[in-house]
Amino acid sequence: MDKTFLAYQVEKKRDTFLGKVLERSISDLPKGNLTVKVFYSSLNYKDALSACGAKGVTRNYPHTPGIDAVGEVVDCLDNSFEYGDKVIITGYDLGMDTAGGFGQYIRVPSSWAVPLPAGLSMYESCLLYTSPSPRDDR
């Protein structure tokens, strides 16, 4: 039997975007060689845009937002990480058109992940991440 998990998923119904928590199957996750059990994900501006249907952020619905995630490796097909390693994934396409950190599990290319730095908790890592605002270049 396939393992299931919970995810916040946004669906498009006509011109309206609705979010709800659904049970999903691990086999529904996208292709990738790294599967991570998510412990934390932060909520930021891009997540709000994705949940509201902003085409510049997410083009394909239904979709799970969450542009960053921190958690433990449960499977790595290329051996770049071991079971139980703590990793951070942020940026790339996570939470945009690749199912993101608002699910209890994600699957991504292993090149998207970095090891959690020593001395930093998983919780702290999501508190520290902030995406640059458009005004940061002044």
List each language-model region with its residue ranges.
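Glycine-rich beta-strand-centered segment in the early N-terminal region that forms part
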Residues: 25-43, 54-94, 100
